[in-house]
Curated annotation (Swiss-Prot):
Superkingdom of origin: Eukaryota
Chief localization: secreted
Any one GO CC term of the record: extracellular region
Residue numbers binding Ca(2+) 1: 322-323, 406-408
Signal sequence, start to end: 1-25
The protein's name: Pentraxin-4
One Pfam family hit: Pentaxin
Tissue: Widely expressed at low levels with highest levels in small intestine, testis and brain. Very low expression in endothelial cells, monocytes, neutrophils and lymphocytes. Isoform 1 is not expressed in small intestine.
Basic and acidic residues: compositionally biased ranges: 208-222
Record-annotated disulphide pairs: 300-364
Record organism: Homo sapiens
Compartmental location: Secreted
Length: 478
């Protein structure tokens, strides 16, 4: 801008003198009249004024353009300064970012090293866990095989024990009818222990039991009538009877003093329940019922009935199944037969025709989920047995347990055709399978097995005509 202004000023200073010199030369010439000269001079003056105005306008434009260019230069300088500041800030930020990136790279390298260490540890842990899982799987297989073998051995042992118990019961039935003159036959029943090392544990136990039976037969005195019912030998409680269930089954056998009773009597068995008719109001609840799941069960009781059928002895119902555990008979069944139900619809039909003679009989129904084995004992004798009945099953807790009626719903839905008519006494339930020796001792009043979870002490009468009594001997009960 400064150069163009200087060029314009130089041109103006050169052009004006030349123009004035030409005008003066024309004025000095004598040619022509005087008047045209002044006119030319006026025109020239006007042209000069116009030129001056144009020049002034041009100079003003140049000045304004110079100011604009100056402002633009200032702006450019400010922009350059700002750009430099921005560049410096960018450089500083780039430097800080580079430093942070270097730190991040260092952290990443550290994390990678730690990750490799963790991966190594995880692989080692995975290998260790895999080996342990394989070892545990092998141990589980071995334990399962041992458990299966133990269950098989236990099942065989239970079968052997019950068979030996049946033989012992048969021997016990023969001993009371022997005459005094035949007492010498007692030793013949016991094998001579010439070679004890050849006898197994079961044979030794059988030998000891037979020796005990022989000693008992020597102190038993004169023979009695073999047709009489089984003799109870519990020490009777206080004399008299009443209609309140205040007595309890013996909890500890050591607290009971056993002594012989009159032949043909069953004494000291505890409370007695009498169901006089088939009314659906005749029901007894056992509380609190089963509080834990049962994988084995033993139900034993003295029973007397003369109605021609047994009816329902026991019924256990839950919300999802009203026949979780039932011992019941009805009009449509064969007289004396009873259905043993565990987890409806599975059941077994048990023969109990011996109970229809109007006399007291002792029954024990035993079941275990191991191979689903079950046994029925009547008056110490094994009358029915089987297996594969609800194998591995558990009777759930929390249901309603009643005597004398069959439940079609929890605590109700009774039917008179399935009601029990008769008497029960000495009822008890165990959460294990009693062995034949315990069943025999219970039937003859020798010893009450330990661990009973329910007895008639847990009974609660629910109205109706059921009578509760504590009889000195069963034959004296109503």
């Amino acid at each position: 801008m400064g150069c163009s202004w200087r060029k314009t000023l130089s041109f103006f200073l050169v052009f004006v003198p030349i123009y004035l010199h030409g005008a003066s030369s024309q004025e000095a010439a004598p040619v022509g009249p005087r008047k045209p000269f002044f006119e030319r001079l006026r025109r020239l003056e006007e042209q000069f004024r116009r030129f001056q105005e144009v020049t002034w306008t041009h100079l003003q434009n140049i000045a304004s353009n110079y100011n604009v260019s100056y402002n633009v230069d200032v702006r450019f300088r400010s922009l350059a300064e700002e750009s430099q500041a921005v560049a410096q800030a960018v450089n500083r930020s780039q430097a800080s970012v580079q430093g942070e990136l270097a730190q991040l790279k260092a952290w990443v390298r550290k994390l990678q090293r730690r990750g490799r260490k963790v991966d190594t540890r995880l692989r080692a842990l995975d290998l260790t866990l895999g080996e342990r899982s394989q070892q545990r799987a092998r141990e589980r297989k071995a334990h399962k095989a041992q458990r299966d073998a133990l269950q098989d051995s236990l099942a065989r042992l239970e079968g052997l024990v019950h068979s030996q118990g049946a033989r012992l019961a048969a021997l016990e039935g023969r001993l009371p009818v022997a005459h005094p003159g035949t007492a010498a036959l007692g030793p013949a029943l016991v094998p001579t222990p010439t070679q004890p090392e050849e006898l197994g544990p079961t044979s030794l136990k059988l030998q000891r039991d037979r020796q005990e039976l022989r000693a008992a037969s020597e102190h038993r005195g004169p023979p009695q009538d073999s047709s009489a019912p089984l003799q109870g030998r519990r020490e009777p409680p206080a004399s008299g009877s009443h209609r309140v269930l205040s007595g309890t089954a013996p909890k500890d056998p050591r607290q009971q003093a056993w002594s012989p009773q009159v032949p043909g009597e069953i004494c000291g068995v505890g409370p007695t329940l009498v169901f006089p008719n088939a009314s659906t109001r005749n029901v007894v609840f056992l509380s609190p019922g089963f509080v834990t799941a049962l994988r084995a069960l033993s139900f034993c009781s003295w029973v007397r009935t003369a109605s021609g059928r047994l009816g329902t002895l026991l019924s256990y119902a839950t919300e999802d199944n009203d026949n979780k555990l039932v011992l019941h008979g009805r009009d449509s069944l064969l007289p004396g037969s009873i259905h043993f139900v565990i987890g409806d619809p599975a059941f077994r039909e048990l023969p109990l025709q011996l109970l229809l003679d109007g006399q007291w009989h002792h029954i024990c129904v035993i079941w275990t989920s191991t191979q689903g084995r079950y046994w029925l004992h009547v008056d110490r004798r094994l009358v029915a047995t089987g297996s594969r009945f609800r194998e591995g099953y558990e009777i759930p807790p929390g249901g309603s347990l009643v005597l004398g009626q069959e439940q079609d719903s929890v605590g109700g839905g009774f039917d008179s055709s399935e009601a029990f008519v008769g008497s029960m006494s000495g009822l008890a339930i165990w959460d294990r399978a009693l062995v034949p020796g315990e069943v025999a001792n219970l039937a003859i009043g020798k010893e009450f097995p330990t661990g009973a979870i329910l007895t008639l002490a847990n009974a609660a009468l629910a109205g109706g005509f059921v009578q509760g009594a504590n009889c000195t001997c069963l034959e004296r009960c109503p």
